Design a protein with these regions (language model features):
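Intrinsically disordered, low-complexity segments enriched in small/polar residues
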Residues: 1-127
Length: 127
């Protein structure tokens, strides 16, 4: 088992947004170990809302087997939903290594990560 985190996304943009997850490397998914990163793939977040509610969706890095020496990582893309489709707003690459999560945001996407405690928290905000 690897280091886990509770993650949520807050939409402070005037328009609704849609999220896409890709580039998943060494992260449990689809309920493995309780981690469900796929929850965010295709998720629509209404303006001025946070998804999911509560403490967030649990995600967990894989820290065994082939992944023991590899950085766990994924990319979260954020698109604004427009009348003509979608417009990219930015993205954030989230990575975990040695029980610490890190972020690399672009565009209108920010992330605040707290690595203290048994589980990290990852709060992504779109402006």
């Amino acid at each position: 088992m690897g280091y886990g985190a509770y993650m949520n996304v807050t939409n402070n943009n005037a328009a609704d947004i849609r999220l896409y997850v890709h580039g998943i490397v060494c992260v449990h998914n689809n309920g493995d170990e309780g981690s469900n990163l796929s929850y965010f793939n295709g998720l629509e977040v209404v303006s001025e809302q946070t998804e999911p509610g509560g403490e967030g969706q649990y995600i967990e890095a894989i820290a065994s087997g082939q992944c023991i020496q590899e950085m766990s990582t994924f990319t979260l893309d954020v698109n604004e939903i427009t009348g003509n489709g979608q417009q990219p707003l930015g993205s954030v690459v989230i990575s975990e290594q040695f029980n610490k999560y890190h972020d690399n945001p672009t565009g209108s996407v920010e992330a605040v990560i707290d690595n203290d405690g048994d589980q990290a928290t990852i709060n992504v905000t779109v402006t």
